[in-house]
């Protein structure tokens, strides 16, 4: 099966080499950095409720993806085959594709919100192109992408089914209870990845995978690291806890106003988000130990809380937004 998938990737790269820049563009549309730029734009400047839903869903989806990668612990194409060209490098396992999964959850939720047939067609095209881009870049097998689509669809459907009843129950809790639920949920999400790693026992990454990755991309791999799991769970906690403080009776976020004001709001908010992210990043050691895990969690939680609560409060103070 792997040989067939490698042959498919090789043929795709050979027959459509001119598509490289386009494929890199669509791959970026599935990057975590893209979501970190777009979700605040919805939350601060367009539709706070949709931004809130997107932030919560992407945090849950990201944490689930990290756990599933460890459960399956399968390689990426360029780790195992010299016949493909590595147009990207990633240290984590390959299946399921986080880009494919994230594309379905992110764009699918927006499409469910917009409810226009033409938008659904556009979303399906974007999702498929993101998946194809990952195969073209040789960072995923076709099976990785297909499973990512399936997991993303399942996650999205569960979220749509449960967000109403679960959200109403959480909304009836006092603020302390809501923050506790956010903390417990994020730690449970991290625990899933920790438990998945524990099930591997003394399994080790094959030396040939590590050597192949370095040979073909120049970058080392660290698929047994839980750094991404810590980041996903921290973002979920910070974003959810901040929203509990800001939403809805305690002020919320008012996204109306002139577009020039919204632009200033976004630029200021994103600059502070970047300062928080990269400032904390200077404190995080490269080793995969508990200290690094805790600092990654705190870094992500601080960024998430700034987006959902700190920034709206700052906007109101600076007269860039009104309390709603």
Residue spans for each PLM region:
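The feature marks cytosolic C-terminal regulatory regions of anion transporters and related permeases
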Residues: 53-77
């Amino acid at each position: 099966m792997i040989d067939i998938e490698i042959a498919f990737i090789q043929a795709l790269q050979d027959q459509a080499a001119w598509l490289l820049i386009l494929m890199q563009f669509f791959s970026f549309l599935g990057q975590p950095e893209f979501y970190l730029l777009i979700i605040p734009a919805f939350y601060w400047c367009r539709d706070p409720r949709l931004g809130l839903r997107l932030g919560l869903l992407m945090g849950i989806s990201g944490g689930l993806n990290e756990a599933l990668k460890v459960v399956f612990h399968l390689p990426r194409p360029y780790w195992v085959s010299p016949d493909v060209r590595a147009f990207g490098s990633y240290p984590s396992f390959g299946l399921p594709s986080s880009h494919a999964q994230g594309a379905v959850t992110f764009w699918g939720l927006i499409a469910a919100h917009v409810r226009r047939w033409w938008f659904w067609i556009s979303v399906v095209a974007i999702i498929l192109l993101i998946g194809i881009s990952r195969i073209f870049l040789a960072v995923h097998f076709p099976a990785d992408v297909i499973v990512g689509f399936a997991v993303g669809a399942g996650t999205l459907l569960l979220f749509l089914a449960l967000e109403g009843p679960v959200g109403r129950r959480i909304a009836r809790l006092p603020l302390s209870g809501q923050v506790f639920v956010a903390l417990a949920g994020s730690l449970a999400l991290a625990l899933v990845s920790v438990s998945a790693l524990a099930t591997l026992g003394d399994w080790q990454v094959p030396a040939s995978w590590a050597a192949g990755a370095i040979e073909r991309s120049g970058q080392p791999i660290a698929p047994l690291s839980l750094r991404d799991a810590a980041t996903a769970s921290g973002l979920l906690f910070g974003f959810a806890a901040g929203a509990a403080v800001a939403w809805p009776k305690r002020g919320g976020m008012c996204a109306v106003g002139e577009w020039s004001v919204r632009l200033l709001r976004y630029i200021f908010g994103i600059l502070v988000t970047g300062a928080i992210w990269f400032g904390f990043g200077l404190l995080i050691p490269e080793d995969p130990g508990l200290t690094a895990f805790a600092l990654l969690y705190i870094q992500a939680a601080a960024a998430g809380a700034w987006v959902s609560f700190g920034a709206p409060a700052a906007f109101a103070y600076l007269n860039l937004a009104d309390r709603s």
